[in-house]
Amino acid sequence: MSLTARIDLDAIAHNTRLLKRQAGDANLVCIVKADAYNHGVARCVPVMEANGADAFGVATLAEAREVRALTRLPVMCWLWDPSDDIPEGIELAAPTMEHLLRLIDAPFTPTTYLKVETGMHRSGFDESAWDEVFALAAEAEQAGRIRVKGLMSHLAYADNPQDPYTDTQAERFRTAIS
């Protein structure tokens, strides 16, 4: 017996349009890590772009470079090592002070998202550091060293929006952005 996966690009197009409508005025960032979850990033990115994607998100720099070759839309990467060369044209998450300082010292002005820890306990700035981090990032942005595009976090139970911990994390995130 052999298994065959059939990827329905029409369904991907439909779902992208549906999500774009539901997003309203917000940007739709399509996450295409792990070869678009094994759907084929080279096939999915153009379909998503044509149907309303505003940006793409990936885990690694290798994935970011692959997606960058497929689109001119923003590409954001959240897992990278501060010792890596920082590529131009890819937006990077800053989950630690080491990451943020590396971005501030880049030879160009990178775009970043500050990652805040809201309860997943994987990565991100702890609430006790938010004031210091936000002040440093604002100062660096005013000096033209970085461009802060937003904040991000990682929900522990995003697949179950009814879980009360999701509300707890959402409230922590609202505190971070206030």
Locations of the language-model features?
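Active-site-proximal beta-alpha core segment in soluble small-molecule metabolic enzymes
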Residues: 3-6, 11-14, 24-178
